[in-house]
Each structure stands twice: as structure tokens, then as C-alpha cells.
């Protein structure tokens, strides 16, 4: 069932000694697949107003985007106090630093995931992000709930590809020289 979600999201975490941190999330999406149940506005105005509405109620704000790298770079310049933008759209992983903003994008279709280890100093307000790109493969035990979601979307992906290419796994060329 489709339910409206807020323009921002706040999640509170605590460590072993009870120290808490409030993390705010702001998000935008490009209108690449418009749906009648999704509202698309100017992403720069929306993410700026979302940031302004949440920044004084949390310790740190992160961005979640489905936008082009060019869009994410512009957002990073617009909101230089967001230490991390977790993005998507290009389908190939990337890691970019714009000022003090780290922009990470994993590969599409659950091929990879970035694992972000975040440290926040409550006294200085400094956030440190250490990120690792991890390939999703058989060495990782599948979470049943996540695995069923991935399987559903992989099935949809294969069906959609077969609408365009009858035999998508067919070898059509064998290079004698390795290609980069």
C-alpha cells in the first residue's frame, strides 16, 4: 500500500554508554520514471528547504538521492555542511569529494553496496565517514527479507530486458584483446 512519506526523516541512535545522536535525512529524486503518486518539484529548492527545516533539530544531516552525479555535485555545493550524500542513478559505483561533502554511489541492481562507518564527535560536531564498497555475492549470507525484495526486482529486470532483447545472455562478440 502506498503511503505518503515526510519531506525529511530523523533517526536517533545511541551507543553503549547511552550517548545519543540524531541524524536527519533529506532526499530528492529526478523524474526519470514519473508516477502519479510521486510529486516532483525543483530538486534544489526542495532539498534546500528540507535541510533548513531539519538542521536545527538534529546533530547531522545526510543526503539520500536518486539523481545524476552532476545533480549531486550541485547539491553538495548548495549544502556544504552535509558530510555525506548517498546517491544512485548512474548504475556504476563512484566516489567523489566536493568540498567537504563525500558523494558515494554503489552499482545498480544490487551488485554492490557501500558500507559507511560514521563517527560523530558530540563535542566538536565533526563527522567522519569511512566507506567501503562491497560486492554483493555468494560469500554474503542473504537476509531473507532483503533477498526476496532483490529477487522480485531482478525478475522484473530480466523480464523487461527480454522485452527488448530476446536472448540477453547470448554471447555476441568475443574479444581477442582484453577490453578495458
Predicted regions and their residues:
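Acidic, metal/ion-coordinating pockets
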Residues: 1-141
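A short C-terminal boundary segment appended to hydrolase-like catalytic domains
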Residues: 120-180
Amino acid at each position: 500500500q502506498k503511503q505518503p512519506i515526510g519531506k525529511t526523516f530523523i533517526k536517533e541512535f545511541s551507543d553503549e554508554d547511552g550517548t545519543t545522536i540524531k541524524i536527519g535525512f533529506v532526499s530528492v529524486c529526478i523524474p526519470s520514471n514519473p508516477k502519479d503518486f510521486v510529486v516532483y518539484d525543483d530538486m534544489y529548492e526542495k532539498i534546500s528547504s528540507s535541510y533548513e527545516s531539519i538542521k536545527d533539530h538534529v546533530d547531522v544531516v545526510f543526503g539520500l538521492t536518486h539523481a545524476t552525479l552532476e545533480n549531486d555535485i550541485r547539491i553538495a555545493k548548495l549544502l556544504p555542511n552535509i558530510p555525506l550524500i548517498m546517491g544512485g542513478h548512474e548504475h556504476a559505483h563512484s566516489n567523489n569529494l566536493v568540498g567537504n561533502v563525500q558523494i558515494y554511489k554503489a552499482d545498480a541492481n544490487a551488485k554492490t553496496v557501500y558500507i559507511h562507518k560514521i563517527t560523530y564527535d558530540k563535542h566538536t560536531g565533526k563527522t567522519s565517514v569511512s566507506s567501503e564498497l562491497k560486492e554483493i555475492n555468494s560469500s554474503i549470507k542473504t537476509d531473507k527479507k532483503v533477498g526476496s525484495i532483490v529477487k522480485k526486482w531482478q525478475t522484473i529486470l530480466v523480464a523487461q530486458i527480454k522485452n527488448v532483447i530476446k536472448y540477453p545472455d547470448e554471447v555476441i562478440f568475443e574479444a581477442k584483446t582484453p577490453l578495458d
